[in-house]
């Protein structure tokens, strides 16, 4: 039994006479009960017929009609009410001009099975799902036309009809689809689910419905590089908000043209929200870049820190791809020691997402079979937690150990001079070695502390604590005067760096784990 208020009677009559399907009639009559939309199309049609013929069905106490009674209904009424009738029968089904068949053809078991097969074949680990629908932009134009007509009908009887009162097509469709798909998958629909099933509809036959808006509201339709069409749903909705009602009626009168074809499903996409894995890595090789070193398509070094970590994670989470980020980076010939450098990996579209602490620890052990890197504190974290790694980037400190050569003999007083320097401010221009990939800039950096250790007459070790972002190699040799002051200028000699180790990255993230 449909619960339609009496004030919507004329709206229902006008829409039905225009060939609108019974479920779209419910939408424009502001029926907000999902159960009504889930009824078979034939039953909705019958109830609407009874409503228009005999009065408000809420006042009727009849039992549901038999199949024979339905068949014997007045055939003249069925010409208007039969949009959803007997899809497999001899009767020609009229395609709804408002939903373009979405609430007719695409709520049937055959389509549900098609979606189920798509999800099942992707082999995701699921606990719930959310359905998203992408609709052709021209549906907004057709709905606007129907709303103006419905509002006019309501106005004749002293009633108003706001556009927001109408049940949105997406909402009605989900009311019907969710329980059917839930039954097939054996899991519940949840609007907050991390697993999304996206159904993309198009309707080439009516693509031209939107075109008149471009002449009326030109500022709404500006071409962009990444969009194939300027007639996006957002642009169309914006134009519909601007256009005057009388201008719209002239350009797009009611009822909209009856389509000869239903919408097409061009894609059914499955996607799981990213999972973030964080940890710290040590790098022990002086011939290993942080990320793949590929120039003009040619790999320069066999592997990288990124690959040695992510290869295992991508395989375990069965993700489609990933994004690697870290708290700074070291050069290919620089080691990272101590507790390591914090990193985070965004695993995109993972198919497996449930891991125990022991399974993550086993993954860490697998990564650590490499003799080039080691990982610690490996853990799954939230997207929000990853932001902590980048917070206060300029205020972070890092500690280094550098093996330095100088041209003149190492004197004790020279080492003491360096030992006594604290909070030394230096000016650094973008180093020549990275100028090809970074813009020219001049920046101020602070060397907080320095401590020296004599090695031999031309070598010593320099232990530094610096502001993050300091170029240590350039601070030693001066980069042809682009870093001032530098170790060479302070000691009044030529200086160069032979080895560099990162001893600590002072970021209290991710949380330490008991390994």
Swiss-Prot record:
Residues 291-304 are annotated as: RNA binding forefinger loop. The active site is at residue 331. Disulfide bonds: none annotated. Pfam families: Pus10_C (PF21238), Pus10_N_euk (PF21237). Zn(2+) binds at residues 21, 24, 96, 99. Its EC number is 5.4.99.25. Residues 55-82 are annotated as: Disordered. GO terms for biological process: primary miRNA processing; tRNA pseudouridine synthesis. It catalyses: uridine(55) in tRNA = pseudouridine(55) in tRNA; uridine(54) in tRNA = pseudouridine(54) in tRNA. One of its GO terms (cellular component) is nucleus. Residues 42-85 form a coiled coil. GO terms for molecular function: metal ion binding; primary miRNA binding; pseudouridine synthase activity; tRNA pseudouridine synthase activity; tRNA pseudouridine(55) synthase activity. Its main location: nucleus. Residues 428-443 are annotated as: RNA binding thumb loop. Belongs to the pseudouridine synthase Pus10 family. Protein with different functions depending on its subcellular location: involved in miRNA processing in the nucleus and acts as a tRNA pseudouridylate synthase in the cytoplasm. In the cytoplasm, acts as a pseudouridylate synthase by catalyzing synthesis of pseudouridine(54) and pseudouridine(55) from uracil-54 and uracil-55, respectively, in the psi GC loop of a subset of tRNAs. tRNA pseudouridylate synthase activity is enhanced by the presence of 1-methyladenosine at position 53-61 of tRNAs. Does not show tRNA pseudouridylate synthase activity in the nucleus. This is tRNA pseudouridine synthase Pus10. It comes from Xenopus laevis.
């Amino acid at each position: 039994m449909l619960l339609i208020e009496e004030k919507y009677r004329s709206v229902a009559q006008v829409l039905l006479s225009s060939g609108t399907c019974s479920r779209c009639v419910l939408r424009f009559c502001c029926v907000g009960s999902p159960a009504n939309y889930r009824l078979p199309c034939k039953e909705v049609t019958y109830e609407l017929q009874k409503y228009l013929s005999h009065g408000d069905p809420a006042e009727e106490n009849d039992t549901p009609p038999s199949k024979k009674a339905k068949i014997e209904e007045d055939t003249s009424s069925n010409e208007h009410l039969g949009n959803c009738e007997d899809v497999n029968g001899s009767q020609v089904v009229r395609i709804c001009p408002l939903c373009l068949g979405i609430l007719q053809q695409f709520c049937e078991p055959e389509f549900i099975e098609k979606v189920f097969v798509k999800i099942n074949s992707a082999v995701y680990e699921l606990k719930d799902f959310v359905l998203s629908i992408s609709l052709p932009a021209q549906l907004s134009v057709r709905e606007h036309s129907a709303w103006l007509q419905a509002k006019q009908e309501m106005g004749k009887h002293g009633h108003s009809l706001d556009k927001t009162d109408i049940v949105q097509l997406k909402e009605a469709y989900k009311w019907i689809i969710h329980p059917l798909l839930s039954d097939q998958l054996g899991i519940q629909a949840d609007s907050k689910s991390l697993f999304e099933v996206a159904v993309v509809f198009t309707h080439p036959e009516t693509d031209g419905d939107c075109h008149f808006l471009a002449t009326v509201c030109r500022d709404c339709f500006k071409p962009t590089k990444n969009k194939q069409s300027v007639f996006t749903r957002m642009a169309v909705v914006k134009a519909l908000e601007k256009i005057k009602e009388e201008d719209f009626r002239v350009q797009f009168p009611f009822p909209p043209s009856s389509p000869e074809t239903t919408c097409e499903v061009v894609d059914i996409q499955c996607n799981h929200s990213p999972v973030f894995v964080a940890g710290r890595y040590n790098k022990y090789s002086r011939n290993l870049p942080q990320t793949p070193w590929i120039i003009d398509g040619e790999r320069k070094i066999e592997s990288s820190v990124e690959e040695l970590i992510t290869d295992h994670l991508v395989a375990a989470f069965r993700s489609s791809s990933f994004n690697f980020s870290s708290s700074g980076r070291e050069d290919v010939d620089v080691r990272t020691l101590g507790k390591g450098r914090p990193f985070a990996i965004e695993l995109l579209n993972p198919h497996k997402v449930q891991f125990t602490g022991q399974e993550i620890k086993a993954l860490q052990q697998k990564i650590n079979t490499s003799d080039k890197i080691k990982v610690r504190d490996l853990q799954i974290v939230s997207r929000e937690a990853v932001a902590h790694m980048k917070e206060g980037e300029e205020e972070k400190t890092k500690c280094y150990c550098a093996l330095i050569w100088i041209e003149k003999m190492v004197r004790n007083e020279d080492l003491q001079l360096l030992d006594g320097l604290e909070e030394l401010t230096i000016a650094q221009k973008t180093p020549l070695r990275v100028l090809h990939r970074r813009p020219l800039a001049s920046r101020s950096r602070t060397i907080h502390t320095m401590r020296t250790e004599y090695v031999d007459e031309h070598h010593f070790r320099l232990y530094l604590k610096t502001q993050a972002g300091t170029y240590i190699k350039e601070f030693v040799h001066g980069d042809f005067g682009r870093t001032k002051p530098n170790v060479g200028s302070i000691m009044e000699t030529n200086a160069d760096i032979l080895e560099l180790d990162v001893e600590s990255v002072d970021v209290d993230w991710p949380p330490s784990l008991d390994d």
